[in-house]
Amino acid sequence: MKIDIVTIFPAYLDPLRQSLPGKAIESGLVDVQVHDLRRWTHDVHHSVDDVPYGGGPGMVMKAPVWGEALDEICFDETLLVIPTPAGALFTQATAQCWSTERHLVFACGRYEGIDQRVVDDAVRRMRVEEVSIGDYVLPGGESAAVVMIEAVLRLVAGVLGNPASHRDDSHSPDLGRLLEGPSYTRPPTWRGLDVPPVLLSGDHARIAAWRREASLRRTRKRRPDLSGARFVWGLGLS
């Protein structure tokens, strides 16, 4: 997999060189390149934004600069991702789908966003997804890009040491799109708090049933909106 990130703040993406993403890069499982958008400017001030047509606060990132950058970086098989609070919600299912892509390009906007014509032009040549990581607004797309890239990379074959590690994650298909239940490790008693006895029993069937029930309880309490939870409760299974 190849990932290109275009931004006016390249250092913002440095965390991708750490931990799991960093190991994936070092091992050659993924090639991550960060590009400074200002490289495609042609004026002495390296301007990337201008005032919005129609008036209003803030500045809008200029189409000609973004157009040249994407022309150079993207090709027919590229999936262009534009982080924006006005986008579709990024989910675990999205991450799973993107984990099999050959080439992802993240266009990190700032200010009031990127001129809409950049998107309108790009969709004529490649697949484009405008995506949000939640119902809130960030100063730019870089933080969202890091979140999405980390979520995707841990699902890429070979990145996790144990391929089964993500199967029981919160929101995963194998967990029925529910939240993962609580986890415990040694010691069995700490500050008067005990590990649930069933987890010490060695009875795998009982442990699996306990974890399923704990997952349902947590989901019902914290995220009753999740479709997996609604389906199970609709069947009267909790």
UniProtKB/Swiss-Prot annotation:
InterPro entries associated with the record? Alpha/beta_knot_MTases, tRNA_m1G_MeTrfase_C_sf, tRNA_m1G_MeTrfase_TrmD, tRNA_m1G_MTases_N, tRNA_MeTrfase_TRMD/TRM10
Listed under catalytic activity are: guanosine(37) in tRNA + S-adenosyl-L-methionine = N(1)-methylguanosine(37) in tRNA + S-adenosyl-L-homocysteine + H(+)
User: What EC number(s) are associated with this protein in UniProt?
Assistant: 2.1.1.228
Instruction: Offer one example of a GO biological process linked to this entry.
Output: tRNA N1-guanine methylation
Q: Which PANTHER family match?
A: TRNA (GUANINE-N(1)-)-METHYLTRANSFERASE
* Subunit and interaction comment: Homodimer.
Q: Which family does it belong to?
A: Belongs to the RNA methyltransferase TrmD family.
Record's function text? Specifically methylates guanosine-37 in various tRNAs.
Could you identify this protein by its name? tRNA (guanine-N(1)-)-methyltransferase
Q: What species is given as this protein's source?
A: Mycobacterium leprae (strain TN)
